[in-house]
Regions:
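Peripheral, non-catalytic segments flanking oxidoreductase cores
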Residues: 1-302
């Protein structure tokens, strides 16, 4: 199994998890997600994201300078007062918040195990002595996002003045910035991954499974052995789509750099996670006039 996982991480950076034991909690999380997005607009705008705080509701996010056809709700670790003070919870949302707190905790545990599994595959394939936790520390900056992809524009017509045009896809092609992402997707479909040859492959929804995609920090840690998954979402034409990613991220002050135990010269200069993440979130909020931050910015030999 480890050799197969190693190959999947090399080829496209995607694999599926089953037998996770979270089915009941996932059903509850789906229910409150759909209820939130079906709620009145005033309630959502009351917890709207701004340039200073990327948490809360947003319906005009940019990917590679194109507006996405989705609305989202983001939150980070609700058990830590230092981070929860920045979360924007809707009014009268005890059930909403309680369910998402439980979901965050369960995904945090599962992400640690998924990260360990990937590192076991890496150590097995490279005959290296690698510590899966050495680059993480105790406090990550992980977050959860609730996604709703409607048929059509998520922004009401009267609010579109001055906004970027919608992109050709519901979510433009990109990689996630962190370590790995645990993704729940409903049965609508629409997620695509880019293969090594550049073609796009449908990631068909499979009941009872969680999609895992590797992200930028993992590609840097493994010195390009493993691939941050390039993915996108095609536009919805007949029914809405919902998805829920848990972004497993390094600690705020972590330095992201290739693992020293791997053979070969380092391909990347180290960089601070907080600086990289800030650049990525800033560009999602407003067009910085250039390509968004990428790990290729830190290649030692471009």
């Amino acid at each position: 199994m480890l050799s197969e996982l190693d190959q999947a991480c090399i080829d496209h950076g995607f694999f599926l998890l089953s037998g996770h034991g979270l089915d009941d909690l996932i059903e509850q999380t789906w229910a409150i997600t759909e209820q939130f997005f079906a709620g009145d607009r005033a309630s959502k705008l009351a917890v709207m994201r701004d340039a200073d705080n990327p948490l809360g509701y947003f319906d005009r996010e940019l990917t590679k300078r194109k507006r996405d056809s989705k609305e989202v709700f983001d939150f980070t670790d609700p058990a830590d007062p230092r981070t929860d003070q920045h979360n924007r919870w809707p009014a009268d949302s005890d059930t909403f918040r309680g369910t998402l707190v439980e979901f965050y905790d369960a995904c945090s545990d599962l992400a640690v195990r998924a990260n360990e599994l990937v590192h076991h595959a890496l150590a097995f394939a490279t005959a290296s002595d690698i510590d899966a936790t050495a680059s993480l520390g105790s406090r990550t900056t992980s977050s959860v996002r609730l996604n709703h992809y409607p048929v059509g524009d998520p922004v009401p017509e009267g609010e579109r003045v001055g906004l970027h045009d919608l992109g050709e896809t519901a979510l433009g092609h990109h990689t996630d910035p962190g370590v790995l992402t645990l993704l729940l997707q409903d049965m609508t479909g629409g997620l695509q991954a880019q293969a090594v040859d550049g073609s796009w492959v449908d990631i068909e929804p499979t009941p009872g499974t969680i999609v895992v995609n590797l992200a930028d920090a993992m590609q840097v840690w493994t010195n390009d052995r493993y691939r941050a998954a390039v993915h996108r979402v095609v536009p919805m034409t007949s029914s809405d789509r919902y998805s829920i990613p848990y972004f497993f991220n390094p600690p705020r002050d972590a330095v992201v750099e290739p693992i020293s135990g791997l053979a070969g010269d380092a391909k990347y200069a180290g960089f601070r996670w907080r600086d990289y993440m800030r650049a990525r979130t800033d560009d999602n909020f407003a067009d910085a006039g250039a390509e968004d931050a990428q790990i290729t910015d830190y290649l030692l030999t471009p």
